[in-house]
Amino acid sequence: MSGLYLALRTLHIVSATILFGTGLGSAFYLWMAHRSGDPRSIATVSRHVVIADFLFIAPAAVVQPLSGVALAWASGVDLLASWLVAAYVLYALAGACWVPVIRLQIRIRDLAGVAVAGSRPLPPAYRRCIAIWFALGWPAFGAFLVIFWLMVAKPDPW
């Protein structure tokens, strides 16, 4: 194995770990804050989740496909291999879920912040946002699990 291949593979694995791990951790903490019902907790956690999105998830989301294509090219894998095409589609699905989730998390942060500042309960808009956020998380999570399997198994489904 060449040094380039090992560097690309390491970059790809590390960025996948950051993307999946930070996403899962952020979802867990925001969901637990929501379950507490405490606007202060929700405001604090959602503020940190939004920061984590921009510091960790966004860069990893860019590095992931770039390092993946470079890794496939460096290892001589056909970029249109069926398992890679399936991974591309699933990655696009996860991204299509993640983009609105970013906006929802910003809205959740803002709604909770206003509730805390005004010593008021969370408004109905908060409940709508968290419900949509929760619903969008599942297909993205499932897509990433299947992508991990595709990267390891490299099956030839068609």
Region locations from a protein language model:
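Polytopic transmembrane helical bundles with strong interfacial aromatic enrichment
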Residues: 1-158
